[in-house]
Amino acid sequence: MAKDKDITETLLTAAEERSDLPFLSVDDIPPITTVGGFVREFNVETKKLWYLAGPAIFTSVNQYSLGAITQVFAGHISTIALAAVSVENSVVAGFSFGIMLGMGSALETLCGQAFGAGKLSMLGVYLQRSWVILNVTALILSLLYIFAAPILASIGQTAAISSAAGIFSIYMIPQIFAYAINFPTAKFLQSQSKIMVMAVISAVALVIHVPLTWFVIVKLQWGMPGLAVVLNASWCFIDMAQLVYIFSGTCGEAWSGFSWEAFHNLWSFVRLSLASAVMLCLEVWYFMAIILFAGYLKNAEISVAALSICMNILGWTAMIAIGMNTAVSVRVSNELGANHPRTAKFSLLVAVITSTLIGFIVSMILLIFRDQYPSLFVKDEKVIILVKELTPILALSIVINNVQPVLSGVAVGAGWQAVVAYVNIACYYVFGIPFGLLLGYKLNYGVMGIWCGMLTGTVVQTIVLTWMICKTNWDTEASMAEDRIREWGGEVSEIKQLIN
């Protein structure tokens, strides 16, 4: 009787720990057998998703705008400054951003599932482990910033751009360490559905960034060093504000102070972080490669200019997909951690339907205004014509790229990073790129052929992920989430100890 009482008390304690979790289901949803039941649960889950996705989208847009605004002001310094900042932002910082964000994404799995299971005390330990690993990674990646000039020259950039971008890269070294703090901290807060505070902090950072950049560049005329100072300061402000929020006690048991446990089981944590990084980088670099391949075509200037406009639009629409990716990753990891497999599966379904509808709406708007919008970006008639020709495939890309990140978010939430990394290699690099190069160069379809071929790789990857999810036993995933929480927390389940 005493043992049964202890078991009951342990279960009640875990339930109480989760009782205040925003929008976390108390119980798993029942099997849905009617249309009315589907509509009711769909409405409930939609509110939960947008509670997370709305602020996440807002945060992504604000942080994306920091770099975009810096590039705008660079154009007021000189043409070479604009080129240098653009190259540093897309090549040097872009490479590092993919690795750091990917490694930080390991926390989406671990913190999300631990939070759903009520193991709140482990979240702070996971956060500190990720800080340790990402700061070591930042130290290694800083070599890329230091030697950016010769590296850029070796891949075909002009001497002037390579030199200017190399100097600017050295100025931007603090940013990589800001990433090392920001990305784990963001995942830590996201897993607890504390998205609104991130949105507010990013908005304040953007509001400060714009006038401060103007003052430093226009009034003080600090040039490129001034751009670096302000951009670094903006990212440091975001980090400091998030840390103050966490250290002030607003996260409860999730943050109980610094612990030596952060240095335990680091190698296993590194493996999951690397798997997350590989999975994300393979996707980011895949789309960066389209611009690179277009640069070797005949009339490369026109092809690259037109493709850059399309990629710019695709990048802005991707902010919606990134927000939905964050939301579904949190929802799936939380519900699996709480042992709610049906709710996790239904959350995925709602996210896919919602993202697909958004993608169709945006695509239809582009197709309707295909004759008008290109002139907003460029005056060259040849570029405008090519952008119009590329608009149908841009519209299709928006739909696919709205769905694909949701599926990737499920993979992160469920802890499938390593498997998806192999899928990405096969679909993107073994199939997509060779097919795109075949269409673009061999069959002379140009930039349209390259894009179509590589988009086919994305379609294949989406189909494979969909098949994986359809074949998934969600009860097994919920059980694996419990095992993962115990393994990575270095602890044994209290309930199993009591039962044994």
Swiss-Prot record:
It is found in: Vacuole membrane. It is a multi-pass membrane protein. GO terms for cellular component: plant-type vacuole; vacuolar membrane; vacuole. Keywords: Membrane, Transmembrane, Transmembrane helix, Transport, Vacuole. The chain crosses the membrane at residues 67-87, 91-111, 132-152, 161-181, 197-217, 227-247, 277-297, 302-322, 349-369, 393-413, 419-439, 449-469. It holds the Pfam family MatE. InterPro entries: MATE_euk, MATE_fam. One of its GO terms (molecular function) is xenobiotic transmembrane transporter activity. It comes from the Eukaryota. GO terms for biological process: xenobiotic detoxification by transmembrane export across the plasma membrane. Belongs to the multi antimicrobial extrusion (MATE) (TC 2.A.66.1) family. This is Protein DETOXIFICATION 29. The lineage of its organism: Eukaryota, Viridiplantae, Streptophyta, Embryophyta, Tracheophyta.
